[in-house]
């Protein structure tokens, strides 16, 4: 076997000594034996043989066979001179320390807010601030009683009231039309998705539309009508593709502040709608045609 497999090293030989073709061949023989003995898988053997044929130094070869059992000779580098080891370890340690100090210096230069790069005590992100996490639980299932009443409460918090021209409520979002306080000829439209977003403005003729309190209806009754609407219209609940509720002013001139609620249901087999008053009184039913 080659000298790096167990024979005494000649004077001046180290892991950095250049490997010869015979050394590479010896390494490949050891790897072949390890494959036959089951120490290496086919993939490990292929990778190591490829590396052995390209090895530059004895150290490169030694690393490829150091964990293998070799009967004819130990597959490891013999002990090198202690002075050479100390020199190599010293250089590695010095390089490591230098890289750490360089990294600390760069990090302090970019992010540091202290007089020294080794002083981390004033990092504001490392100090406890006593702020508790805030978990947001806005209403999402708006066709439920809790979701519907929660939506109206969110409206009061956002605008101070529930006045408006129209409120359209989908299962997980809603839209609201309100008067522009700066110009009563304009309508401000808002969308709710966990919270009321910013307004979009549009010029509309609203002379014949009243501003009403859009919360003045029986929410519990409305939810019950929504849940029974598919069966009311002769549709299967599993066939329903969309459902939404429109709340706007009633057209009856004798009750100017009253609301009219229109519930639209659609499916692949047709759709229909219901119209009812704020107290749940049914005004009209349009069955699927």
Swiss-Prot record:
Keywords: Cell membrane, Membrane, Signal, Transmembrane, Transmembrane helix. One of its GO terms (cellular component) is plasma membrane. The keyword ATP-binding does not apply. It is a multi-pass membrane protein. The chain crosses the membrane at residues 90-110, 257-277. It comes from Mycobacterium tuberculosis (strain CDC 1551 / Oshkosh). Residues 1-19 form the signal peptide. It is found in: Cell membrane. This is Uncharacterized protein MT0054. Its main location: membrane.
């Amino acid at each position: 076997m080659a000298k790096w497999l167990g024979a005494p090293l000649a004077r001046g030989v180290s892991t950095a000594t250049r490997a010869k073709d015979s050394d590479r061949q010896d390494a490949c023989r050891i790897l072949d034996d390890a494959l036959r003995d089951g120490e290496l898988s086919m993939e490990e053997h292929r990778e190591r043989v490829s590396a052995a044929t390209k090895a530059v130094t004895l150290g490169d070869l030694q690393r490829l066979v150091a964990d293998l059992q070799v009967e004819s000779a130990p597959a490891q580098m013999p002990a090198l001179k202690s002075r050479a080891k100390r020199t190599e370890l010293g250089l590695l340690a010095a390089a490591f320390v230098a890289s750490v100090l360089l990294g600390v210096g760069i990090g302090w230069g970019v992010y540091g807010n202290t007089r020294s790069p080794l002083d981390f005590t004033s990092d504001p992100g490392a100090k406890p601030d006593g702020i508790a996490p805030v978990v947001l639980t806005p209403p999402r299932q708006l066709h439920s009683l809790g979701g519907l009443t929660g939506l109206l409460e969110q409206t009061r918090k956002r605008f101070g009231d529930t006045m408006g021209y129209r409120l359209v409520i989908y299962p997980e979002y809603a839209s609201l039309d309100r008067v522009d306080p700066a110009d009563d000829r304009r309508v401000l439209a808002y969308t709710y998705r966990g919270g009321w977003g910013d307004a979009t403005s549009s010029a509309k003729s609203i002379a014949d539309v009243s501003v009403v309190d859009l919360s003045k209806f029986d929410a519990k009754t409305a939810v019950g009508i929504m849940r029974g609407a598919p069966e009311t219209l002769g549709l299967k609940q599993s066939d329903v593709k969309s459902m939404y509720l429109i709340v706007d002013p009633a057209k009856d001139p004798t009750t100017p502040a009253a609301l009219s609620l229109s519930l639209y249901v659609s499916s692949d087999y047709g759709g229909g709608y219901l119209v009812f008053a704020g107290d749940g009184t049914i005004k009209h039913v349009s069955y699927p045609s």
